[in-house]
């Protein structure tokens, strides 16, 4: 929140300031994270590994008046993507670093709405078609170690200027990109995302 402080407890009357503080929260079923409208989270990102329930989903949204809260990541929020196996052709990149403004890692029963998201590439002077340009996403969804994931709702998001690598079509690149990765205990997991809206 533009009126927050990371020393606060994150309640309505004592909001946090940065997404770094939000990323440290241990969100539980039924919890809400509301970002103040008019806030700009420059060079920040929202990376979550949370699970709500059907009865008590977790909600990420906005409050107040004015423009949608803007998460302007600019190539930050870097994580390592690894499918776990080579893909159908040896030239296809199957692992590497990705910058994601919003990362939903093994999340379920979660709603994210009413946000503006960008992840520009020009910050580091990368040209549009640079062959080793950073892979970027606005929203990345990953299913890996929790089996079937249920009900991820993305609504009223304005995602723009996500400038990733135009060649790595199998990596998380684009406005919204969901991927199933090889789980750590592959023999015990069946990966599926049952419902995305």
How should each PLM-predicted stretch be described?
Residues 1-20, 37-39, 67:
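Right-handed parallel beta-helix/beta-solenoid
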Residues 20-26, 41-52, 70-74:
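Short, T/G/N/S-enriched strand-turn elements that build extracellular solenoid repeat scaffolds
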Residues 25-28, 36, 118, 160:
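Structured segments of extracytoplasmic/periplasmic soluble domains
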Residues 30-31, 39:
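Surface-exposed loop/turn positions
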Residues 34, 49-128, 163, 167:
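Right-handed parallel beta-helix/beta-spiral solenoid domain characteristic of secreted/periplasmic
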Residues 44, 58, 100, 137, ...:
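Extracytoplasmic/periplasmic beta-strand context in beta-sandwich domains
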Residues 57, 61-66, 108-119, 147-163, ...:
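Right-handed parallel beta-helix
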Residues 125-144, 161-186:
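Asp-box/WD-like beta-propeller blade repeats and closely related beta-sheet repeat scaffolds
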